[in-house]
A protein has these predicted regions:
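Short helices/loops that flank or line small-molecule/ion binding pockets
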Residues: 1-2, 46-49, 70-73, 85-108, ...
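A conserved helix-loop-strand patch within extracytoplasmic ligand-binding domains
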Residues: 1-56, 61
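Extended ligand-binding regions for polar small-molecule ligands
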Residues: 17-38, 131-172
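Stable alpha-helical elements in mature extracytoplasmic
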Residues: 43, 64-67, 84-87, 102-106, ...
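Short beta-strand-to-loop elements that line the ligand-binding cleft
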Residues: 58, 75-83
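Surface-exposed patches in mature extracellular/periplasmic domains of secreted proteins
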Residues: 78-81, 122, 164-168
């Protein structure tokens, strides 16, 4: 299998209780590419300072868990859960300070009545070890279908179709960043 260009680019972010000191993280609601070390490192250092000594809830065996452990290590208490719903119960009960998950999950969680006391905080992160780009797998050697899919996806990104649909259904702009070089090399 070979992936075409991504048709969506998700993000990961934090959820915490309204009024929590964690709710004041830098770059709240702004995109942060963790692969851009010059831009990301100062922000992640500040996020780490805010999270130091706090309990962060993540779903086990996810790229979100990997990121928390890689960036913050023993400075935070990383608590893992089998499901996001289990973790949501703990944050609303005050047993953890903050949770970290995909932005799409976060917007879905905030729409639930039982999560009315939660708020998104911190940057919308992508890159590094986060699994955020979503692409269609096409068999190797099938260059014609891949080229057609890539063309349609690029057009939908450029004309705003992906943005319109992703905001409608997930409340986030999931339009991928498509560079001309990346498109021709894939």
């Amino acid at each position: 299998m070979r992936a075409g260009i991504p048709y969506a680019s998700g993000v990961a972010t934090f959820l915490t209780l309204k009024g929590s000191p964690i709710a004041t993280m830098p770059m709240t609601g702004e995109r942060l590419n963790l692969n851009d070390k010059n831009a990301a490192d100062p922000v992640m250092t500040r996020v780490g300072e805010i999270l130091k000594g706090k309990t962060v809830g993540v779903v086990q065996s996810t790229s979100q868990e990997q990121l928390i452990r890689a960036y913050f290590g023993s400075d935070v208490d990383t608590r893992t859960y089998k499901t996001s719903a289990e973790r949501d119960l703990d944050i609303t009960a005050g047993r953890i300070d903050v949770e970290f998950d995909s932005g799409v999950y976060a917007t879905t969680a905030l729409a639930k009545a039982e999560n009315q006391d939660l708020i998104m905080t911190g940057p919308f992160m992508r890159g590094a070890m986060l699994a955020t780009d979503v692409a269609l797998g096409i068999r190797k050697g099938e260059t014609e279908p891949k080229a057609k899919f890539d063309e349609v996806i690029r057009a939908a990104a450029e004309d705003g179709t992906i943005r319109k649909l992703s905001v409608k259904w997930s409340k986030l702009d999931l339009t991928p960043t498509l560079s001309p070089a990346a498109a021709s090399s894939q």
